[in-house]
């Protein structure tokens, strides 16, 4: 089975978005590869060969974002099963606020930011699991320009 783990970076949220900057794809257990503005179509082509497409909020954001920018080959030729880890998180951990309350009142509390409390975001899960995605989104003010730092962030 060909599983593709994916993420995208854009210049804004869905309604205000004007471009997809990059797609990061990891096939099965391989290291992720980022496809920047000049080779987005190559990344989309890789996705067409997936049996399962896995990502955080791919149903609510990533897939609609790709469709918004004319990646109609995806809709016409896509047979893969979607595994949206945001939906999985909400289904598997409906009482996350209780778990986080205990986390916030434990010796590990200094490691868990208050803005992650009760959230199912990648940032929050990164802190819970000790795999921080990075601070690119927090530290940058310009999402309108593609950078290698953005590509590195997308691959995490």
Where in this protein do the model-derived segments appear?
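Ordered hydrophobic segments in well-structured contexts
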Residues: 22-24, 34
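A general structural motif
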Residues: 1, 49-51
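Entry/capping segment at the start of metal-dependent catalytic domains
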Residues: 1-22
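Active-site-proximal helix-loop-helix substrate-binding element of RNase H-like nuclease domains
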Residues: 14, 30-37, 52-156
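Short amphipathic alpha-helix with an adjacent loop that forms part of the alpha/beta core around
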Residues: 40-47
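A generic structural motif
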Residues: 26-28
